[in-house]
Amino acid sequence: MSNGGGIACDIENAIRMNADCMAVQTFIGAPGESRSLELLARTADAGTRYGIPTLGVVAVGKQMERTEKFFQLATRVLAENGANIVKSYYCEGFERVAAACPVPIVIAGGKKLPELEALEMAYRAINEGAHGVDMGRNIFQSDSPEGMAAAIGKVVHEGYTAKQAYEVYEEIKNSK
């Protein structure tokens, strides 16, 4: 597993910790690209030997454009360098990004959004080809993290619309 600067946790430690997946942050089109792709390939090779999948994470710097073209290229490069799953960002044209990615793709939650907006983004992403979402602050900074986690689960696993999921969120939030 990589923190972008090097391997933070090698395969032996991942096995010892009973990891379900390893993650490597990559920097496509930015300083550190070659090194991060080398780390991804090495981590994916080790993971393949031991049956642990590797998540390739598309890092986006503040100066980089979050365009469909960039994400199509970046996600494909990660898959071609061994990622079994790719984590990227939702963008206009995401359906084409997901279609061009030869491995399952999940979206990052990004910056904190109002709950309904985060659910709408998750709903659109799933309907446009994402296999899941990897949200942090949109859950743990919510007024009801439990409600938001449940609502996201409904969108991803049960096909709820954003509005239906928001009702789940509100119900759990108001029951506390």
Predicted regions located by residue number:
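Histidine/acidic-residue-rich catalytic or RNA/ligand-binding cores of hydrolases
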Residues: 117-119, 143-152
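Alpha/beta enzyme core
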Residues: 2-107, 112-135, 154, 160-168
